[in-house]
């Protein structure tokens, strides 16, 4: 028998309207799209846009935990367990893309890094990535210190950017 239903799939709902507003994100930066990010149709490729989300969350993590990507000194080891991207509009080169980043949720051993991409104030995509804190034997609880740092960049209502 062939399964025709969606019982075995996982999808993400459309993003909340507040996610489409740059002023909901506590961390904002600009990045230029590269010529090589274009596909054959002249659009910025979806993989290139995902790389911009990845860069925004990496920049946020590094600002919160400066040694996180230094394997010799890091005290935290994060791994991605889930990544949901919504591509909402086309983008073209050349473009300056404003990235927004923040924390969407804090769990026991993980948190959701939430990012948005904006061109001329219009949201072209959002991404939610579940990052899990790992120890030697698997996931470990987030410390109070880590939780406090993450709380400083929780997504929130308009910040007046």
Residue ranges and their predicted role:
Residues 63-69:
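Short, surface-exposed acidic-centric catalytic microdomains
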Residues 8-63:
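Catalytic strand-loop segment that frames the active site of acyl-thioester-processing enzymes
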Residues 44, 78-80, 124:
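A broad, structural micro-motif
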Residues 1-24, 29, 87, 91-96, ...:
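HotDog/MaoC-like acyl-thioester-processing domains
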Residues 81, 95-98:
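Short Pro/Gly-enriched beta-strand edge/turn motifs at strand-loop
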Residues 61, 73, 158-161:
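Hydrophobic, proline/glycine-rich low-complexity stretches
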Residues 74-90:
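Small beta-barrel nucleic-acid-binding modules, principally OB-folds
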């Amino acid at each position: 028998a062939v399964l025709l239903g969606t019982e075995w799939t996982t999808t993400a709902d459309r993003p909340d309207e507040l996610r489409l507003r740059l002023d909901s994100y506590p961390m904002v930066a600009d990045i230029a799209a590269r010529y090589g990010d274009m596909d054959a149709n002249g659009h910025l490729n979806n993989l290139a846009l995902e790389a911009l989300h990845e860069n925004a969350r990496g920049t946020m993590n590094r600002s919160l935990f400066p040694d996180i990507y230094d394997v010799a000194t890091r005290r935290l080891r994060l791994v991605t367990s889930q990544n949901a991207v919504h591509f909402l509009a086309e983008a073209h080169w050349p473009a300056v893309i404003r990235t927004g980043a923040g924390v969407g949720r804090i769990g026991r051993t993980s948190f959701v890094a939430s990012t948005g991409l904006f061109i001329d104030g219009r949201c072209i995509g959002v991404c939610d990535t579940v990052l899990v804190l790992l120890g030697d034997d698997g996931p470990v609880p987030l410390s109070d210190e880590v939780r406090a740092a993450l709380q400083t960049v929780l997504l929130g209502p308009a910040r007046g950017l």
